[in-house]
Structures are given as structure tokens and as C-alpha cells.
């Protein structure tokens, strides 16, 4: 019995350490130094690895890349390379609320997306060094990180790029995972550039809309008013474009669910990634009842 227990402990310990982490500076100039933590399977792979790049949340003013460590370790233990990045927190020290300045909000999205492109560019240029399959680069993020990856995936980087020659012509990510994210314009997502996506979001989120609403539910006369299209709206748009899309709705839930699938139940994301890599087209909406009460205006039919 003692031998069995010891064996179980050793197996758990081995699994917990079945990946290696390396801290890398993926961009540096005279005023900026950006790092990432790369997690790779401990055992070298004979084939190129798919890569997930994770962007943390924090309202573009806070948060740390270390918050993505557990998610990245999980993916590394399942055969993926996975990186969590530091990025420019443009809103730090600025008013991001309804009475703030709208250009600062747009710039926050832009700087975040540009740093994501820089990290992606690093891996493309160093794909042999890290054994990365450049055709299988996924992106993911929570809250502000989700807004970063959504705009990074669908903005025209030739127009929005702050740096030269960041990504190859016609580059597309292999897929995207968004936790309580939103995008400024659904029209950015077209039949030509749409990619497989997984979303999870609380239906009563008042910080980032689940459907279509103003950011932070600001009034229309607010100086920082900006319409955003959240997970439910993007999901339906992707379905209309006949693309793979999965949505996990937490009925009655707020913004506290923005990191749920990164922190626990990570197998939902892993299954999505495997489906994409296997070339499967999946369209489904899963509803979780949280037991939380919401205002009638926030209740969707599938949450009743």
C-alpha cells in the first residue's frame, strides 16, 4: 500500500514538472523592454509544436504575465508550446472610465495588439530554435487580454502597425480563445479573415458586454463612449460566416468569469485546440447556470 502511495506521489510530481520555462525578451528598443515566459514540453518533440500566446487581463493598466503560468503549464503538459507575455499597459495612470478620453481607450487596444504582433513575430523568426509550427499559432486572453487578441487577430496590421515589417503578408492565427472580450467593429471579421474561435463570458457582464453595448455601459453622452461587440455577438457573426465557433455562457455571471476556463476546466480549451488541429468544424453554445440573479434586461432567452 505504501509503495502504491509513493508511486502515485511520484507520478503527480512528474506530471507537475513535465514542462520547462524560459524567460525571453521578445522586443527591446531605447525605451521599451518586453518579456515573455515560454513553456515547452520537457521531452523534445520530433514534430513541430503548436503554439499558444496568452495575454493577461487588467484593464490595460495592471496585471502580470505570471497570471498565465498555470494555463501555459497545462498546455505544455499536453504537447503545446505556450507563452504568456508582458505588454504595454497604455491605460496605466489614465482615466479608462466613462468620463475619460476615448483616444486613450483606442490606443490601449492598439498598443496591446502591436505587442502581440511583436511576440508573434519573434516566434516566427525563431521558429526553428523553439521548434514552433508557424501555421499553428493560437492566441488567447482574458478581459483586456481578450480585447487585445481580438483586435490583434482582425485589425489590418498594415494600417494599425506601430512598427515596420512585423508579420508576414496574409498571416493568420490558427485560432483564438477569448475570455470576456469584445471587439470595436464586427465588420473587422470577414469571410476572408475569420478563424476558429472559443468564447466564454458572463451574460450579465457590465464591464465588457456579453452582447452589443457600450463599454462599461457608458451613457451615449459620455466622453469615453464606445460601442463594443462582445462574445455572444461575435459568436453569432462567426456562425453566420460558417466558421467554427464555441461559446460558453455563464448565465447571470459578471466579469468575474473572464478567466474561468484559463484557471479551471481548461480541458474545454484543449478540446477546442485539438478540434481545430484535426480540421473539425464545430459550432456549439454551452450554457452554465450560475444561480445568480440579474436584471430582466440582462436575461437572454437561453438563461431563463
Task: Give the predicted meaning of each segment.
Residues 103-128:
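Alpha/beta-hydrolase active-site loop
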Residues 1-21, 304:
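Bacterial Sec-dependent N-terminal signal peptides
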Residues 164-241:
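The feature captures the conserved acid-bearing segment of alpha/beta-hydrolase catalytic domains
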Residues 18-47:
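N-terminal cap/lid segment of alpha/beta-hydrolase-fold proteins
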Residues 228, 232-304:
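C-terminal catalytic histidine-bearing segment of alpha/beta-hydrolase fold enzymes
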Residues 66, 121-193:
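Primarily recognizes the serine-hydrolase "nucleophile elbow" in alpha/beta-hydrolase
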Residues 87-110:
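Cap/lid segment of the alpha/beta-hydrolase catalytic domain
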Residues 44-49, 55-95, 206-210:
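Short substrate-entry loop that stabilizes the transition state in hydrolases
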